[in-house]
């Protein structure tokens, strides 16, 4: 178990936040008097108390672009930890503040303030600029910052590595070079050697509906704001180096250098064929950050030239 003596602020207490709170004490040994939960929803107080939280450490506050620094600095100092489960908040702004204040920060996914309908491609480039800025400084960003490490992009990125390792160990048992690549975490070179061209990340909800189901009704089990944003944004793909784009008229823009492709159609109007363990299904092509981060992590370069990247 990890011992942590500093303050911990959990920002957000929805379904995922509650699940995390229930389990965090099994992973981290901390002082319960130093664990704070910040949420805008006063109705979360009862489940927070039922899960063993201290009443005085429950902070009901609507976090905005104008007040987030003022609220967070009451509970966080250098070396403390901010765990972000919130939506419609400015990831980039919070990241910058944490880096400047030397506060550890981890969040589950990309977000921005409600007034900004953002591009995941542009946000990715801006995050890379911030990474370069803070990585070269000796006075700030002294503690780890991990972005987008929820189920996806986070967990599915580990699944990709596990999948590559599984293919190598089951279909190429005698390939010693592949074993060495996996052993030394060179998954990009392993994917290149295996000739992996496309990776699908799929969500399929198999929960039963206790109601008369018909195709005119949407039963949503995901965060409403995120679902709204993702379904009404243009579909995106990160294109591999092998791709020959013969549907350019359907594209809003293509950036071959980074592999960014945005279609003119929104996700609600764009379906594609995909698979899950029980077979094929038609899914909506929804934008999500792992299309960028997984493809980027598996790039192989010769000098400055990208010679391999899967879609």
For the regions a language model picked out, list residue spans one by one.
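Rossmann-fold cofactor-recognition segment
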Residues: 52-65
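Short amphipathic alpha-helix with an adjacent loop that forms part of the alpha/beta core around
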Residues: 66-77
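Hydrophobic/small residue at the entry helix of a nucleotide-binding pocket
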Residues: 16
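N-terminal glycine-rich "phosphate-gripper" loop used for MgATP/nucleotide binding
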Residues: 81-91, 95-97
């Amino acid at each position: 178990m990890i011992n942590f003596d500093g303050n911990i602020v959990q920002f957000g207490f929805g379904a995922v936040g509650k699940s995390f709170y229930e389990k965090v004490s099994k992973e981290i040994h901390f002082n319960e008097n130093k664990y704070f939960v910040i949420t805008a929803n006063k109705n979360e107080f009862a489940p927070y108390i039922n899960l063993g939280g201290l009443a005085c450490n429950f902070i009901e506050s609507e976090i905005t672009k104008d007040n987030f620094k003022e609220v967070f600095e009451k509970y966080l100092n250098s070396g403390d930890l901010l765990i972000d489960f919130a939506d419609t908040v400015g990831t980039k702004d919070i990241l910058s503040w944490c880096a400047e204040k030397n506060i550890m920060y981890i969040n589950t996914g990309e977000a921005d303030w409600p007034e900004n309908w953002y591009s995941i491609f542009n946000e990715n480039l801006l995050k890379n600029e911030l990474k370069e800025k803070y990585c070269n400084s000796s006075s700030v960003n002294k503690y780890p910052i991990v972005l987008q490490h929820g189920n996806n992009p986070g967990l599915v990125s580990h699944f990709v590595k596990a999948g590559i390792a599984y293919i190598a160990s089951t279909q190429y048992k005698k390939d010693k070079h592949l074993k060495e690549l996996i052993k030394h975490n060179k998954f990009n070179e392993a994917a290149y050697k295996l000739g992996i061209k496309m990776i699908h990340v799929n969500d399929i909800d198999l929960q039963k509906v206790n109601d008369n189901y018909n195709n005119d009704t949407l039963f949503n089990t995901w965060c409403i704001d995120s679902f709204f944003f993702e379904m009404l944004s243009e579909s995106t793909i990160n294109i591999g180096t092998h791709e020959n784009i013969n549907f350019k008229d359907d594209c809003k823009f293509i950036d071959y250098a980074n592999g960014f492709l945005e279609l003119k159609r929104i996700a609600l109007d764009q379906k594609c064929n995909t698979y899950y363990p029980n077979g094929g299904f038609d899914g909506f092509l929804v934008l999500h950050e792992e299309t960028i981060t997984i493809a980027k992590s598996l790039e192989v370069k010769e000098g400055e030239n990208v010679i391999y990247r899967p879609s």
